[in-house]
């Protein structure tokens, strides 16, 4: 039976990079027989422009019924500070689908090491994953703004913490078997709970080493010794900051994918970069983050590990051959980059 994939096209460069990702998927499917169907939908600013909410009911329904969801990019300067913004649609989708676990792999391509702001010896061997809790904590707590006072409620349950830490251990089992749990337990009650739960979950994974780091120390280590990390797991706010810090290690956002997983429903796959409205429509956007997000989808949602590796190898060999878009020092267009990757599948 054909797998159902919802493609949320989004704003800015979203349509261009989504098309690139789907072209790679189509080329791969022709070689491997992967059977799927695509349900393309606008999302974010495009929905608001049509005088609708940023997450229409029909889009939510289609997403719930899908086997996987691809999202290109959302956001537009015209909505900065507006009461209704594209980002609200994404937050609502995460909450409605219970996309509690954000997975962001951080790996430096050998051919792109020169882009990193760190010295080559600092980034040698960097290959880790940030696992961020995505639907709880301060982002989804009560926000109270008074004239001369404000409060944001930071709230976690045992169950919310347990499931994200367990997810990190499951990922680590197939890697170097090291989990670094990041908190602020010397100050925050939620972090004291976090550390307690981490210790308890670790008992179920005797083959995996658990380490603890305070968030300020972890932020420094990510710059001074990033290769020490294997799997990082942390709460929503800390994960938001640290995952963005980790993206700087590669020197470009254009080659980094991400996934957001639920417990039972479909997962969502997206690049980590924004909608780049300044270059939208010019055909120069880097499609690699989107293409690698497709690879993550094939691996995580459909168990097609070799297909995912074929895409990753095609990306790596294309970069090594010097085929680079402008953001990473070359002149290749979106189409040329995509065609180079397809040719190497």
Give residue spans per PLM region:
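Glycine-rich phosphate/nucleotide-binding loop
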Residues: 45-48, 114, 222-323
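Short acidic loop-to-helix transition motifs that present clustered carboxylates
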Residues: 44, 111, 213-220
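N-terminal beta-loop-helix "entrance" segment that forms/cooperates
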Residues: 33-57, 222
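Buried hydrophobic packing segments
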Residues: 21, 25, 198, 290-301, ...
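Glycine-rich phosphate/pyrophosphate-binding loop and the adjoining helix
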Residues: 135, 139-181, 185-187, 205, ...
């Amino acid at each position: 039976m054909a797998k159902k994939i919802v493609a949320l096209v989004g704003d800015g460069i979203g349509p261009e990079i989504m098309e690139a990702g789907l072209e790679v998927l189509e080329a791969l499917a022709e070689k491997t027989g992967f059977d799927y169907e695509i349900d393309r939908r606008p999302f974010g600013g495009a929905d608001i422009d049509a005088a609708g909410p940023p997450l229409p009911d029909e889009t939510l329904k289609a997403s719930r019924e899908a086997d996987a969801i691809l999202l290109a990019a959302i956001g537009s300067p015209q909505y900065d500070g507006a009461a209704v913004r594209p980002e609200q649609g994404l937050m609502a989708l995460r909450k409605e689908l219970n996309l509690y676990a954000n997975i962001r792999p951080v790996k430096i391509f050998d051919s792109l090491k020169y882009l990193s702001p760190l010295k080559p010896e600092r980034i040698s061997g960097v290959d880790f994953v940030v696992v961020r809790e995505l639907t709880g904590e301060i982002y989804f707590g009560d926000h109270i703004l008074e004239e001369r006072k404000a409060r944001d409620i930071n709230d976690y349950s045992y169950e919310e913490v347990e499931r994200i830490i367990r997810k990190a251990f499951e990922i680590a089992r197939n890697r170097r078997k090291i989990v670094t749990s990041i908190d602020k337990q010397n100050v925050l009650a939620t972090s004291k709970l976090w550390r307690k739960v981490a210790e308890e979950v670790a008992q179920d994974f005797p083959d995996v080493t658990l380490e603890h780091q305070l968030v300020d120390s972890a932020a420094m280590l990510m710059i001074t010794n990033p290769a020490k990390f294997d799997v990082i797991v942390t709460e929503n706010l800390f994960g938001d900051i640290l995952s963005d810090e980790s993206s700087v290690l590669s020197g470009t956002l254009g080659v980094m994918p991400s996934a957001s997983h639920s417990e039972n429903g479909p997962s969502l796959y997206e690049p980590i970069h924004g909608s780049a409205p300044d270059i939208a429509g010019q055909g120069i956007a880097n499609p690699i983050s989107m293409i690698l997000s497709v690879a993550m989808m094939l691996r995580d949602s459909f168990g097609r590990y070799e297909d995912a590796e074929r895409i990753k190898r095609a990306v790596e060999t294309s970069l090594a051959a010097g085929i680079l878009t402008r953001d990473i020092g070359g002149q290749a267009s979106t189409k040329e980059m995509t065609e180079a990757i397809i040719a190497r599948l």
